Amino acid sequence: RWWSARPTKTEYLGKTPLVVGPDLHMEIKLKAENPKSVGADRIVDCTYGYRKCKGSCIIVDFGTATTFDYVNNEGEFQYTVIAPGLGISATALTSQTAKLPEIEIKKPESVLGTNTITGMQSGVVYGYIGTVEYILKEMKKALNDYDCTVIATGGLGRVIASETDEIDEYDPDVAYKGIRILYELNKGVK
């Protein structure tokens, strides 16, 4: 990259920041094809999920993209699914059509829209619930791990998590908790 926040932050804080990446001491093992390609957000999410569950888990992070990251009972992160996020889906619907307006992403009162706005909200939200449920069921089947815990996080996760039994819990602070764990594991490591 042509830029870095590290020198500025180091000078400002008088401390060297903890840069999340595959070289940190971690409780999880990055078994992805290319560990350096695993984003910091996904590392901290999986760190927290594995620590909390003490076993296999899928962390669903509803961000710009929605990521479904699997950590097995041995703490190995190897498998992932990445889908367009709810916001991207809604934006595409608006930007790629002639007359559909921008919408607030929220669950409408009914799956049956009574106007363009509620019809779009229904399609985006309920369509996304279906996508999430299908991906989670297929992941569990492919992994032969039907008992893994599914934790949802991310700003729009609350919209989906409450609507499906495939998600065991929603926690908006997964990333912060994962960062804290990594900090504790690495604070004395040089």
Which residue stretches match the model-derived regions?
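Short beta-strand scaffold segments in enzyme catalytic cores
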Residues: 66-71
